[in-house]
Every structure is written in C-alpha cells, then in structure tokens.
Amino acid sequence: MSTGETQFQTGGGITVSLAASTVDGNAEIENLVDRLDEARGVLLSSSYEYPGRYTRWDMGFADPPLAITSRAQDIWVSALNERGTVLLEPVYEALAALGSTAGIVDLRHEPGDAAGAVVCRVERADRRFEEEDRSRQPSTFTVVRALVNLFSCDDPHLGLYGAFGYDLAFQFEPIALTLPRPAEQRDLVLYLPDDLLIVDHEGGIAQRFRYDFAVDGRSTAGLAGGGARVLYEPDFELEASCDHEPGGYAAGVRAAHEYFARGDLFEVVTSQMFSEPCIESPAELFRRLKEQNPAPYGFLINLGPASAGRGEHSVAGESGEWLIGASPEMYVRVEGERVETCPISGTIARGQDPIDDASQILALLNSAKDESELTMCTDVDRNDKSRICVPGSVKVIGRRQIEMYSRLIHTVDHVEGRLRSGFDALDAFLSHTWAVTVTGAPKTAAMMFLEQHERTARAWYGGAVGKVGFDGSLNTGLTLRTIRVADGHAEVRVGATLLWDSEPDEEESETELKASAFLDAIRRPRSAAATGVAASVPSDRRVLLVDHLDSFVHTLANYLRQTGATVVTRRAGFPTEEISADNFDLIVLSPGPGRPDDFSIGPVVRASLDAGLPLFGVCLGLQGIVEYFGGELGQLSTPMHGKPSAIRILGGHLLDGLPKEFRAGRYHSLFARRSEVPDSLEVTAVSLDDDIVMAVEHRELPVAAVQFHPESIMSLDDGVGLALIRNAVDRLVPGWRAG
C-alpha cells in the first residue's frame, strides 16, 4: 500500500524522489534473504533487545545502483546497473572538486561489467597532521565523506551500507605490514541503495522506500535496475582446518606475556581462524545464525566477486564473497551530536539453565581479571572519544552491564560523548579504528604486535559493518562472530583479550568456545536444535505425595512425575487406612511449616510401614521420620529460609551418583539433632557451613529423607535435585537390597 511520494534535493544538488509503501515485513525479509544468495546487497538485522541500547529492526536491499570499493589507496565507485550510470558524473565532479589538495589523484572514468566506474587513488599527505586532526588526513574516507556530502539530506534511511575492513585502520595509523594479503582482498565495500526495506519490529511497521535520482537533466526514473548474479558453489573436497595447530594459540599468549612484563602492552586481542567446508548457502547460514545466536548486529552481506565493483571485468566462474554475522558489539553509533560505543570485555560460558547462568554471572562479576580487561578497554575508548568530543562530555553511562548470548555471557560498558564543532560521524568512526576490544592497548603497539604474531591477515574481522547515513548519522557494529563465505568454504575468526593475568590454555579454550556456535551453524541444520527438555519414561509406579500445606509441593510432584511415576497429591489429614487401600508404591512426605505433630506425621509413617511401603521425606518429612524413630529436633538460632548450603555426602544409597559435595536450597528452622539421631537411622549427608543433618536413611527399611529441598532452584546445579528424586523412586521402591 502506497503511503505517499515526496521530493527533496541533496546537498550536492541531486533531486531525489521518494515513494514509500507499507509491506508485509516478514515475507519481504525472507524474500530478501533468498535474493542475497545471488544478488549484491545488504541485510542488517537486530534480533536482540536491551533497554536504552538495542531494539529489534531490519533494514536491507538488493541490486543497488552504486558500489564503493577500495583496496589500500585505490578506490572504485562503480555503477552496478543502468540506474547507477546517472550518478557517476556527479560523483566524478564531487571528487574532482576536491582535487589533489585532498589527496585525490589519478581520477578517471573506466569501463566495467555494468556501466563503468569512477576510479581514483588517495595519496598520503606529505605534511604533518596534529593528533586532533588525524581523522581529516587524506584516506579512503576522504572519498566516503565526499559522497556523504554529495547526497546529504534529512532522509533517515538513505546512506551507504556495507563492510569496512580491518586494514582501513592503517590509513589512520600507519604501521609496517608483514603478513601477506591475498590479491582479492578488499578493504571497503559500501553500497548506495535505491530500494530499501525497513522493518521496525518494536513499532510493528514495515515499509519499502524507493528512490529515484535526477541530476543535470538525467534521471533514474524508468531505468532498469538489477545486476550481475553469482551463485555460491560448495567445494566438497575441502577439509576443516585452522591457522593454528593445537596449543599454537596458547603459545601466542605466552609470547604476549613477555610484552606485558616489559610494559610494551597492557592488553592485546589475538585471533585464530577456523576454516570449514560449507555445503549450505549463505542465506541458510544467516537463518541458522539468527535462530541460534540472536544479536544486535546481525547481517548478511553479498559483497560480489572480488573483481566486481573495481572497474574490472568479472572472470568467468569467479566465486563470490559473503559476510554472515551475529555481532554482539556496537562499534560506533552517532545520532545528531551524540556518539556512543559499547565496549565488550569479560566473557564466561552460559550455564546449563537460568540458575546456572546466575552463578556464572556472579563468577564473571567477581573476576578481577575480567574487570581489568573491561576497565582498560573503556579507558582507551574514552580516549578515542576525547579526540573529537566536547570536553567533559565523555561519560560512562553503563558499567559492567550483563549481556547474554547463545553460549556466552559478557560484561559491557556503555560510553557516550558529544561531537565537537567541526567533527562529524566519520571523524567519530575513524577516531575509534579499531576498537580496543579487537586490538588492545596501547592501540598502535597492539596492532603492531598482531601484525607480527597472528598467522593470517584479518581481512574483514575486527572491522565494522553498518550504515553511514546521509543525514549525518552512523550505526555500525564490530565485525565479530562472523562467517566469511568464499571459494566454496566458510571461515570463522575469533579472538580473546589477553593481559598479564591470562592463562594460555584457558584463552585458547575461550576462542574455541566462541567459534563453536558459528561452526555449529555451518554444520547443523536449524531443525536439529535441542529443546533441553528430557522426556520421562512411563512407569507403573504410583506415588502418594502427602501435602503439609507446603508452597513447593507441586514442584516436588512435577519432579516425581519426571521419573515416569503417577503422582497423587493428597492434603494431610486424610484417613491413614487410605495408604494401604489405594495401591501406592511409594509414600512421600512433603515439606511444610510448623512441627511434625501439627500434621500427625507419625501415624502416616506407622501406616506406611504397616503396609510395607517405602517412605521418602523432604524437610518437615525428614523431621517427622526422625521423631518417629526416636530422634529429637532442635531449633536453629538463625533460620535457613531460602538460603543455599554446600552439602557433603557421608554415605548411604539415596545420594549415589551425586557429587560428593553439592549445593542445595534450605527452608527450615527445625533440625534433627545429630547427637540424638537414633541408631536405626544413618546420617548420610551434612551441611558444610553449620554441620546440620541433611539426609538420613534407615539401616534396614526402605526409608530415607533429606532436610534440604531437591525441588528448589537452589538445588539445580548439576541436576542434583532431579537426580535425587530419581534415586528415591528407583531405589526405595524395590528396597535397598534390590536397589
């Protein structure tokens, strides 16, 4: 549905006609993903929410009219279809107006596959630039800035979209390059779209924006779009490999230690690259990543073949190149005068469940090493902003905040500043090249170390992807957690932040963990994702759960049902004759408030034993069993309500297969006095912090009990709670001897 047409003029005198329409966002996104298997273009997709930082959105396009490509100092602005030819002349004139004083040399038109290109070279300046002006020295960004000025307008969506390679940093901060670069490596691929899909998932709005451009009597209206097609072709003969042998990455950590010891480096982020044969298409990999690894900066970018957009004729059969990513880290975002970054440093693996996650988060937040990592990153980031921001405006607005991803938990800082007069979004972009979280500190020394010690050139890794808006905005994410697909295979490069406290083998393991989610996306179909819910095995066992007005009884019943048993939960106070009349196989005494006598637990125990039925008690249930057999109860000086304790196993059968020490949750004030536990009962577990009886078993009868709550979230570590309940059902019902 059309929502209207508008017309405006850019800062360079180009007339833009805009037609907007409402579309089916999900259907259009799926269609675009499929098109990007063959057509050049970009899809940027945020599938991660964080209040005040990230929302869910998609923006993308295929078959753009213009591409801007660079390698070292050489730059090509190429028309990719007939519509792009209309824009080449104003591009040429904008660059010609800058001339050699801005470093633009060898400016010319060249023929190409579609309709030619404007080609130039940017020469390094032969004069000194003060540090405050370093971002204005001649570089590839001189051309990018000229294009932004040519198309400058208030439209919030029109801009240059694509990928920025790692080597662009050396135009800002030159160092000696020692690693070989492949001939096909490109440092920059940006596209100017004319047909944009924008989906705001939070607002529930999906729109298509179509642009026509007119200048000097020529217009794109009515001209054909489209572009060349390159199909991905897997190479089935390739084998998986890594640019480091096992232990090689750890050896690099040890080498870095020498630099830390001398004070040459404070931290450095070294990487290793894994290569895999890849039979799936880039579109399928993107869908897998989005499903398995939601992230604020997801992307699928078809960069075209290496020769495309460089004023050259494509070679028959030449492979394309794609970037598919799920980056967790904002690189630089600029809106108006506000500059934002979100440095990530400090990493720990996700737990097995939310409770385990909480323990991992505490471990991460309590790690002095991880705190030091992030502190150094943020100090360097603040320095990057101070070059181009208003004095006093650079502030940390979020400190060591937790962000959780599919397999990792990170600590993140949120830093902002306000641009000084005379600086723009590209100055902010350049002043941060590249983020300390992918290089190190001091930054120049770290990049020199990486050039000397990494095994292969980074190419796109550690650079950025995103959008340079013609309205002065900028939104970019770091090129991390990215799959590069080319030549029939897929590459995944991952790194870790090293500092003096780093343990070499642990850092190597961290890189392997980071890579695992993306290697899985290459290897494993979407439908193979595990649900994490274990199926119960049906059995013919019937369990009576006696409810002592407890608030956790239904969770306990749930655990019992997970063993496959049929569970009947019956409020205490029923006639005890029902115990023998209803064909139960196990009687379970629940927790509850008060004392055992308040619920007449003794008669229930007597009736169960008379019926020859095994008995299992939890919390109040343990207290009732101990009293029945002649033991005495005491009262804790400090109640243990909703508090965990470490439990040590002393013996018995009920706790077989559990760790010798484990964590469990307690909700009680009464306890069984250990010195008064009768000889007929064996104490099989105690709490480590206060030496309270935590489990008992009858020496001859199938009777057992625990003081802690196996059904509590505090008892989830290593699946201890459910394992205990399985033991109770499997071992008590047949009796100890048979179990």
Label the model's feature ranges:
Residues 284, 478, 598-606, 721-725:
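Charged helix-capping and loop-helix junction motifs
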